[in-house]
Structure formats: C-alpha cells, structure tokens
C-alpha cells in the first residue's frame, strides 16, 4: 500500500526532492499580498472565467441528479461528490498534518450514479460550501503565509493548494454545465 506521500505524487500533487524550507519571511509588500489574496478569493468564488457553484447547481431537478447523458461517464451526483471529496482533501491536506487522503482514484468518487436521497444531495452541497468557505477563510487570513511550504507536504504551498481547488472546481463545474445542457436542464 502506498504511503500518503507516495499517493500524493501519483495524483500529480507535485513533489520536490528539496527539504521543506522554514516559513517565508514577510516581504514588506502588503499591497501585493492583499491583491493576491483578493485574486485567489475571486477565483475560489467563481469569478472571472470561473463558474459560481451556486449557479451551476441551481434549479437542477432531483430526478436528473443521477442521470448520465449519452457519451458522458458521469452524473451530477458523481461530479458533486467528487468535487466535495477532492476539495475536502485539498483543504485538510493544507491544514492537518495527520490527514490521510482517500485511496486514489476510487476514494474520490461515489459508488452510485444517483444520490441515495434528497438529504444526501443537500448534505453534499452543504459540505462543499462549508469547505469552500474554510479554504477562502484560510486564504483571506493575513497570518496565512501563502508561499511557505506546507511542513508535512512535498513542496506544496497554500497558494498552490488554493489554485488547485479553484482550478479543479472550475473544471468539474464546466462538466456539470455540459451535462445539464445535454439533459436539457440548463438555462442560457
């Protein structure tokens, strides 16, 4: 069984052979630091070319949450749960040295195409939003050194993990919109 660190390498988390550096000293450039944090928060919140999570899931009929359009290997439920699990993993890795990631790739996807209940769907939505808010709070906190290597990582930084979360969410939210279009459940 691969170790947590080996598992991270196989998922493209990025690794370096260098030892973790001590936390980066303040640059004395608060305006640039503030601008970077604002940009990251904008991306995490669905700004720019990114899609807002709430808009992507709004109005999706319950009966279509488990539907897979022809030619696509996923349903809205699979995408939602995958995004929730991956975002939770990224966040927990960022803040918890004892965190153990799920097994790759099976641990990042639900077993079924459809949510077992409306309650399961709502719980997943709530947890996704909660963890997104936690990532945003981490980035917004001026005491968070965005550039320092995460001590229990392999060269990752909070900056990198925040960008990873924003990019991963944007990618799969785009898939969700495509799936909804193919099902006739997306408004233009």
Annotated model-derived regions:
Residues 17, 23-26, 30-50, 54-57, ...:
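Short, contiguous alpha-helical
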Residues 111-149, 160-165:
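Acidic/histidine-rich alpha-helical segments that form the ligand environment
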Residues 8-9, 43, 63, 135, ...:
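Low-complexity, intrinsically disordered/propeptide-like segments
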Residues 1-26:
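Polybasic, lysine-enriched low-complexity intrinsically disordered terminal tails
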């Amino acid at each position: 069984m691969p170790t947590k660190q080996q598992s991270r390498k196989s998922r493209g988390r990025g690794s370096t052979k260098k030892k973790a550096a001590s936390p980066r000293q303040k640059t004395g450039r608060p305006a640039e630091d503030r601008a970077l944090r604002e940009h990251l928060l904008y991306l995490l919140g669905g700004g720019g070319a990114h899609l807002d999570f709430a808009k992507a899931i709004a109005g999706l009929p319950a009966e279509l949450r488990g539907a897979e359009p022809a030619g696509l290997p996923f349903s809205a439920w699979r995408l939602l749960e995958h995004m929730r699990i991956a975002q939770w993993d990224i966040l927990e890795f960022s803040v918890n040295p004892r965190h153990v990631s799920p097994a790759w790739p099976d641990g990042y996807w639900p077993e079924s195409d459809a949510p077992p209940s409306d309650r399961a769907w709502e719980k997943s939505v709530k947890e996704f939003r909660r963890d997104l808010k936690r990532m945003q709070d981490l980035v917004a906190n001026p005491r968070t050194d965005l550039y320092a290597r995460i001590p229990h990582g392999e060269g990752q930084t909070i900056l990198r993990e925040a960008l990873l979360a924003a990019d991963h969410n944007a990618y799969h939210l785009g898939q969700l919109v495509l799936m909804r279009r193919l099902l006739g459940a997306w408004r233009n």
